[in-house]
Structures are given as C-alpha cells and as structure tokens.
Amino acid sequence: MPKYLIADFIVEIEPKFDYLKKLCEPFLYEGERSADFSAIPSDSYLNSLLSRMVEGSTIDEAEEFATASIFNRKIIHRGAMLVHSSALVFDGKAYLFSADSGVGKSTHTKMWLKRFGSKAHILNDDKPVVKIKNEVPLCCGELRLTAEAELLTTKPFP
C-alpha cells in the first residue's frame, strides 16, 4: 500500500481517482518508517458524501474531501490540527496569519513575499497543520497547496 509523508506523518492512502493521485504524488514516501495511520475512505462513504455535496461535484472531489476529513480527524489524536490560515516561512521560521475568510490572509502573505523576496516562501495558503513535538510548536504544509506555493516540502518549521 502506498505511503505518503504529509505534515510529518506517514499516511497510507490508496488514491482511486486522478485528482487525489496528483495531489499525493509529490508526498510519496519510500522510506522505512511504518505508517502512523491510514486515511482510506470506503466506497460507501465516498458515495454517501458525493450525494450530499453541491450539485455538479465529482467523485474525484469527494475522494479528496473524504481522505482529508479522515486525515484531519486522525491527526487530532496525535497532537496536531489544521489551522485556517496562510502560512509562510521566513528565515527558517513559520508565520501564520489567521482570520475569517475574505479578510486578506493571502494578500498579507503575498506582501511578505514581495517585501522579503527569496528569504520567504509560502508553506500553505489555506490550512497548514500545526503540531507540538517535544514541546515545540511546528507548522507543516499538507496536500492542498495553492498555485502560488513556491516550496513543496514535508519539513516542519518552528
């Protein structure tokens, strides 16, 4: 079963549809660590979810949403959670800008990129994972990177 390194977790995922396959591809893990957990939705869960999604939604979208939901529930029990924010790395440290939708988190992040150039890069522009490891808060990217993301990394940043 394929394993992926996502937000510093080794996760078993079996993408069935192209959208999730493409999202997962850069995170493929071939190392020796065993999986921390699996995030594999059942067919019945996918079909149930799709029937409740906005008209016109695809099974590909349902699979990504279902897999992300499983992932999100499982990381909570491992000292991590998603934070609705825009996260960037500046001089090796993560900075998160969190607010209601439409306030300007991404705009603020882009201003940092413009101001600091190559010293800064986007880690995740929507829902980075924050976890505590050895009493240190760390920020990690996850599958849903934006087109503006300059760095695809599995490395956590303090």
State each model region's role.
Residues M1-S101, M111-L123, V129-P158:
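A noncatalytic interaction/capping subdomain that flanks phosphate/NTP-handling catalytic cores
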Residues H108:
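Hydrophobic positions on the alpha1 helix immediately C-terminal to the Walker A/P-loop
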Residues K105:
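Conserved lysine of the Walker
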